[in-house]
Amino acid sequence: YPSRTKDIDDVDFSTGSVGLGVAITSFASIVQDYIKSKSWGRDQQLGRMIALVGDAELDEGNIYEALQEGWKNDLRNCWWIIDYNRQSLDGVVREGLFQRLEKIFDAFSWDVVRVKYGVLQCAAFD
């Protein structure tokens, strides 16, 4: 996992595998939007909250609470990148789960962009 003390890039939250880092990005976005709405925060430049998530991590319930909070607060500066590698400490993630997950994200009005294959993934971040 990323470390604020060991990595040279900006890493705001170092967390474990229980979905906390994913949820933190949503709530940090809400806080950032609140600060921006105040007179003392209007000059602040908005950042992006990005979480790298394993598909097995989507078993955690707090992630779905964060999805709903994102919908209720119309978040636009929060990105979740889900690595659908079907690996888990407990076993293998079921095939076909990603289609169900996409429907859940759609239901909460999150934009879903599916990127497959290394070349396309690299192009998404150029």
Q: Which sequence ranges carry the predicted segments?
A:
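Acidic-glycine-rich active-site phosphate/pyrophosphate-binding loop
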Residues: 1-7
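Glycine-rich ThDP/TPP pyrophosphate-binding loop and its adjacent helix/strand module
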Residues: 7, 11-126
